[in-house]
From Swiss-Prot:
<dbReference type="InterPro" id="IPR011009">
    <property type="entry name" value="Kinase-like_dom_sf"/>
</dbReference>
<keyword id="KW-0346">Stress response</keyword>
<dbReference type="InterPro" id="IPR008352">
    <property type="entry name" value="MAPK_p38-like"/>
</dbReference>
<feature type="modified residue" description="Phosphothreonine">
    <location>
        <position position="16"/>
    </location>
</feature>
<dbReference type="GO" id="GO:0006915">
    <property type="term" value="P:apoptotic process"/>
</dbReference>
<comment type="function">
    <text>Serine/threonine kinase which acts as an essential component of the MAP kinase signal transduction pathway. MAPK14 is one of the four p38 MAPKs which play an important role in the cascades of cellular responses evoked by extracellular stimuli such as pro-inflammatory cytokines or physical stress leading to direct activation of transcription factors. Accordingly, p38 MAPKs phosphorylate a broad range of proteins and it has been estimated that they may have approximately 200 to 300 substrates each.</text>
</comment>
<feature type="active site" description="Proton acceptor">
    <location>
        <position position="150"/>
    </location>
</feature>
<dbReference type="GO" id="GO:0005524">
    <property type="term" value="F:ATP binding"/>
</dbReference>
<dbReference type="InterPro" id="IPR017441">
    <property type="entry name" value="Protein_kinase_ATP_BS"/>
</dbReference>
<keyword id="KW-0723">Serine/threonine-protein kinase</keyword>
<dbReference type="GO" id="GO:0033554">
    <property type="term" value="P:cellular response to stress"/>
</dbReference>
<comment type="similarity">
    <text>Belongs to the protein kinase superfamily. CMGC Ser/Thr protein kinase family. MAP kinase subfamily.</text>
</comment>
<feature type="modified residue" description="N-acetylserine">
    <location>
        <position position="2"/>
    </location>
</feature>
<feature type="modified residue" description="Phosphothreonine">
    <location>
        <position position="263"/>
    </location>
</feature>
<dbReference type="InterPro" id="IPR038784">
    <property type="entry name" value="MAPK14"/>
</dbReference>
<keyword id="KW-0963">Cytoplasm</keyword>
<dbReference type="GO" id="GO:0035556">
    <property type="term" value="P:intracellular signal transduction"/>
</dbReference>
Amino acid sequence: MSQERPTFYRQELNKTIWEVPERYQNLSPVGSGAYGSVCAAFDTKTGLRVAVKKLSRPFQSIIHAKRTYRELRLLKHMKHENVIGLLDVFTPARSLEEFNDVYLVTHLMGADLNNIVKCQKLTDDHVQFLIYQILRGLKYIHSADIIHRDLKPSNLAVNEDCELKILDFGLARHTDDEMTGYVATRWYRAPEIMLNWMHYNQTVDIWSVGCIMAELLTGRTLFPGTDHINQLQQIMRLTGTPPAYLINRMPSHEARNYIQSLTQMPKMNFANVFIGANPLAVDLLEKMLVLDSDKRITAAQALAHAYFAQYHDPDDEPVADPYDQSFESRDLLIDEWKSLTYDEVISFVPPPLDQEEMES
């Protein structure tokens, strides 16, 4: 929203009024969720197909207002090939007093990893390239002290050239309801986050990458649990039951009691589970799908694993600038979050145009 204010036009889409700058044409709805609706559009200024997201009721409560600020701050910070970044942010409002709507513009990504897995079992080389890119993006996100928390195939966008971007990071705060039953929101979640075992760290995302990688190699969901308990049973069938030292570290009395009540199971031999897979892939999976999060491989370590030998380049796996998230602990009023958000909209500077993208 920098420079002079553009000319806006209004149209109704899915019973919602959209008011956007004239540069964005041919808006067509592509989906909506709890936090907003998304239209595909053509950006006449760059020649790119873009996704425009209109946040729904961004300032209706303190929770909403803080979430809006969080999403904008995160997207503005992310500048990496394998992470979705912000192309534009705008509001039709001419002043803070009028400010009520926020629109975010990102690249329009064709397919997600779900579409790709459904269509075919991937070659080992495809799996290497896709997982390498996820880890390259995660190394960047984690270096800014951000945890994705909700990595799953539908949050990984892939284009025709197999180039991948991570979507929707750092925002996920799922309700219990959304995590209940036979749902993909939970199948990729690390056990410690799913069951509130203990304070979790960035390696919750590595667990998810392990689940995704196993699915790419086999064509099937690794742990398609019907509920929390069934999911834990499926996980432990593979990893074995947690050792005593790990159980003792769990602050939750209920979690400790429940796990101590389970029949002891040994860890399975991963080579017998992933028959026919590249032995290096199996070795990496064993380092990702570890119950003890302190012993799980990190994104930076995983990039240096022999499985990615043909892609790994330590000089081209960048880290992020420091990200100040001290706002997370602040208790502010709606109007204060709104004012901070308005400042972020106004101060936005669009990224330099990528020649390759404009030609594609």
